[in-house]
Structures are given as C-alpha cells and as structure tokens.
Amino acid sequence: AIDIGVRYDFNRINAKKFYQTSRWIERGYNDDFSDIIIEDFGTQLLVKPSFDFHSVSLSTGLSYDLGKNRSILFNYGLSNRAPNASELFSDGLHHSAARIELGDLRILKETSNRISGTYNYDSEKATITVEGFFNHIHNFIYLEPTGVETTIRGSFPVWEYKQVNAILFGADLNMRYEINRKFVVQNKSSFMKGKDVSSNRDLIDIPSLKTTNLVRFTNKKWSNFSAEIQSELVFRQRNFPNNNFEAYIPRTDSFILVDISSPPPAYHLLNVRSDFDLKISKKENVRVAFSINNLLNTSYRENLNRLRYFADEIGRNFSIQLIYNY
C-alpha cells in the first residue's frame, strides 16, 4: 500500500518590540533592519518587524506485508517549520532558566527531509517494532551557550539561538512478550545522534541512549489487580559540543573555566506501580492506583533538563490515584 499526504501552512508574524540601542548595534541589526525602526528614544529603539513564512509538508509511505505476522514500512517526509517568537525576539533574562536568551531576527524556516524504515512483528504473544531513521535538516534552529553577561542582578550565562545544517539519525526498539495470561514483559529502547554538518560538530541537547524494561503481573479475579516494576537505564551522553567559556571573577581578579558542556553521569531508576478496583455498586467502582517513582532514591541529573546545573532531579516520590467510574 502507498500513502501520500500534502499540507501547506502560512505564518505571518507582526510585532512591536523595544531593543536597547547597544544590543541592537551589537547584533548587527543596524545594518540589516534599519528600515523597521519606528521610533528612536536614544538608549532604546522601538521596532516593528514583520515576517512571512510559507511552509509545505509532504509525507509518503510504502508498506509491504511479508506474511507470518511480519510487515515493513518505508516513509519519506518533507516538512518546514517557521521560527517561533522566542527564536526571533528573545532579548533578556529567562527567569525560570536563570540565563539570558538572545533570539535572532535573521533566523529562517527549517526544512527537514526525513526517511525511515520500520519492521513490525505482531503475533498472539509477541510484538516487535524496530525503526531506523535519518533526518537532514536545513537551517536547523538550536539554542547554545556563548558566554556570560554581568547585569545589576548578577552574572548569567548567555544562550543564543542559531542555525546550522544538521543531520539526525537513530533507532527505536519496542518489544512486548506475553509469558502467560498473567505475566507480560516489555522493552523500549532508543538511540539518537545529531551532527552539525556545517562545522562537523556534535549537536547540543541530543537525548542519550535509553532503555526501559518492565514486568507486569495481572489477575482479573483479584479485583482486576495489576502490579508492575520498571527499570529505566539512561546512559551518559558522550557526543556533545564543547561550549565551555571563561568568566572573570572580580574578587580574585582572575578568569575561571565554566564547564557548561559536560553531560551528567549515567543513571538507573526503579519504579513500581499497583492498581485494583474497589466495587461500590453494580454500576460504580473506584480504581485505586499506588506508585513509587525512583524507588531507590537515586541522585541523578537529566541531561536535557535546563535546570540540571543547579539541582538534582526529584528523589523517591509516592502517588495515589483514585478514579471513580459510574
């Protein structure tokens, strides 16, 4: 079977924004965008940028039945993404991330060409899905640290939105096996790598290798009881760009190296969950679920969490969920 889909999107951004004159000149906007200045207040400029983005998306796929519960799928997708307001206009302290973020009025739309291949096996007891993909993105938009800036509120790292030509490739694995009517085991694993082909550097903020295993026990005769234990293993990201920079410390009149690039160590988490039904009447029941995440109270930091520089992730936590059905 062959499937084809096409979509067109039009985005228009009309905005008014104040820039500090010093920042405007520092970013080189006085040469490229002098025509959008509508008022000059000396230390500040009021500008009125307007951008139009035309986007076309196309997807086509070919599936083939191999017989004996097996099939393969090949897919090609073309997509465009217009930059959002943050990527264009960010210009100051991002309070929730404790960093200064700078957008760029020159940012263009992204164009992605993605090809993928998927193998499926689906039987009464087992399900296996393996997918590999390759994605070439022209004008890939990303956010990267470039230095430090001192303000009256303190010193903050500066992150800037940039664009490069990039490739992303990886694989996903999903497996489920029913041992018997009561026990099921599952595995989900994912791998991904990103490369800046413009300068042959690794991309920032790429997920590391992750594998999750789960064992579930179910007995419908015991008030629809189920219990499961989940193991989540996340490896350390070993492919990352070096964006470290030096910062001046006035108290010691010296420079120190700020290691903003090194990813945190690998970590392993155990999670457990159990649920069952409490019957109230013939038509009413309450589904009770109890779970413990991070059972071993592991100290870890997630590489993609923008607050990982300041604190660990949440430790052991308990939750109870009640669902009333009627």
Question: Where would I find each of the regions flagged by the language model?
Answer:
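Conserved C-terminal beta-signal and adjacent last beta-strands/turns
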Residues: S63, S71, G77, N113, ...
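Surface-exposed extracellular loop regions of Gram-negative outer-membrane beta-barrel proteins
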Residues: A1-V47, F53-S59, S63, E178-K193
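Outer-membrane beta-barrel translocator domains and adjoining extracellular loop/strand segments
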Residues: N14-T21, S86-D91, A98-I100, I141-V148, ...
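Outer-membrane beta-barrel channels and translocator barrels
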Residues: A1, G67-N69, S112, D122-A126, ...
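Transmembrane beta-barrel domains of outer membrane proteins
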Residues: A1, G61-D65, L108, T118-D122, ...
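Gram-negative outer-membrane beta-barrel transporters
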Residues: N11, F133-I137, T146-V148, G154-N242
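Outer-membrane beta-barrel signature, preferentially recognizing the C-terminal barrel domain
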Residues: S34-S57, G61, D65, S71, ...
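Transmembrane beta-strands of outer-membrane beta-barrel pores
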Residues: Y8-N14, Y76-A82, F89-D91, Y121-S123, ...
